[in-house]
Amino acid sequence: MTFQTPDSSHEHIAFIGGGNMASAIIGGLLKRGLPAGQIQVIEPFSEQRARLAQQFQVEVSEAPGASLNRAAMVVWAVKPQTFRDAAEQSRAHVGHALHLSVAAGIRSDTIAGWLGTERVVRAMPNTPALIGQGMSALFARPAATAADRQAVERVVQTMGAYLWLDQEAQLDAVTALSGSGPAYVFYFIEAMIQAGTEMGLSREQAHKLAVGTFVGASALAQEATEPPEVLRARVTSKGGTTYAALTSMEQSGIKAQFIQAMQAARQRASEMGDEFGAS
């Protein structure tokens, strides 16, 4: 694996934050051949540091320091509310590096200001990244070179699929759609399981049927050339069982409520940029 950053003679990568998303990326990088000795993690919690060291055999530290000078890339896998403090502690050591943020809400101009560099890329992944099946959207500031983008892609592809955005504001919509999206799917799976048990199935049976249906339908939607509304129409015969269910949903305004809920998520993503990025 080669990061190909123009001002670095090595492939060292540092993670600020060692939670689930960082662990998913680290695991993917190791599987793709990046030596553990070229990865370091800054993680304030001792339990997390012990887990990371044992699981991945990577270098772990409690706080940022001069060791960050080695990093060709720094991945910011911190909570939005702790980003600023972490950035201020690290700034003196990471000005030369390419920066990839997976923190929700914090805008790239804010990150660039905190770090004193314009080589910043934002990513919005989602939790299926934990098993390499995630969907991420990326936005790069103009100072990020083509080589920087390629380096980011090599990291992000360890989490699953990705796409690039032309406008950073679109990341708020991405957060509402795919970033929070897995929770919506789990919510509907919960409802299907509950309905199944209320109709006489065991919980195990309902769980297997509900999850299997989402997996199969998602695979079909991904492979099909037709849009989802066509696929839905094909299995909806007027007067049939599917028709009865969808008619009930439409009469209850479920689609409109769902869209409204996603708008609320987008609005909250925008607010987080103001709230946690305020000077």
Describe each PLM feature range.
Residues 1-63, 114, 197-198:
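NAD(P)+-binding Rossmann beta1-loop-alpha1 motif at the extreme N-terminus of oxidoreductases
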Residues 39, 67, 202-209, 231, ...:
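Small-residue helix-packing motif on alpha-helices
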Residues 26, 46, 56, 64-138, ...:
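Rossmann-like NAD(P)(H) cofactor-binding subdomain of soluble oxidoreductases
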Residues 120, 170-176, 228-233:
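Short pre-catalytic strand/loop immediately N-terminal to key active-site residues, enriched for Gly-Thr
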Residues 36-39, 96-97, 119, 204:
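Short acidic capping loops at alpha-helix termini that bridge into adjacent secondary structure
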